[in-house]
Amino acid sequence: MLSQFSSQDGKQTLKDYFDVPLDVYPVGRLDYDSEGLLLLANDKRLNDDLLNPVNRHEREYWVQVEGAVTQEALEKIRAGVSINIDGRMHLTQPCFVESFDRPLLVGDRQPPVRFRKHIPDSWLRLIITEGKNRQVRKMTAKVGYPTLRLIRYRIQGITLENLAPGQMKMLSQTELYNLLQIKKRQSL
């Protein structure tokens, strides 16, 4: 599904699953082949604050990669790797990354990610504070481990915990700003 409300190339969109007011839109995006947490809001300031890299809001991803990841590869990701963004090389900011066992709340993907079960895979927990186009996929590929599955688990203090796939949870502006650690601006 596309993480937008307008259709494109006949692919399913948010409009096919959620009935929300016209002024509600996704804050940030997920790639077509990614899954996980997506915020929907009608607050333009939230979009600006959350997506501005100066504010360094954390995004946590659970990443299934092909192969048994080495410590050397993890160190390279931690330090920052050079990736291509729109035809220009970009050095990613240092980040947190660790190997971990497949999270319990992650079910099997439908359709399956791959059919070659004899090749090992690894799960990574990766936390970044910037959000370039397909950044996580490019980072893991750069160190030799293509991403098979990508799940955004957390944005700052908002997580997928206690949410089923496709489930929506309403938050007040105060709750949202507190969880995202965004200070409310004073009205003039």
Predicted regions and their residues:
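RNA pseudouridine synthases
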Residues: M1-L188
